[in-house]
Amino acid sequence: MDKAEMVSLDIERGAALLDALDRAKLKVGVALWAHLAEYDDWRLVVSARRFDSLDLRDAYGLLIDSLDAAGFTPRTTPPVMILPMADPFVRELRRRFAKTKSVEGMRLGGQMIGDRFVQDGYVYRIE
């Protein structure tokens, strides 16, 4: 199946979501849109130490509560995937790009990163 293209509306929606998480003081360390080989669509991948301190269900609950407070609805919330900061994918992203001055807007694709094959990606933040 052909992968859907990333459009500016998705990029803006991802930026608004990240802004909402920043306002909720979640200190997101990694945020990017990723079209991963194991899924057939785009996912907004986020990682934060605050999520790591919770079990996955509570982490998604915190995410949803933070987005709800910012006015996001189930209809306007993009598909989000929370990964631990220790996940091999996140660790490899941080190893490769954390010292890069500006990663916002960087495109990734056609490569293995950690244990995941990234078909395409749009980066907001890697710290």
Residues covered by each model-derived region:
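Short edge beta-strands and adjacent turn/loop segments
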Residues: 25-42
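Short, non-transmembrane amphipathic alpha-helical segments
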Residues: 54-75
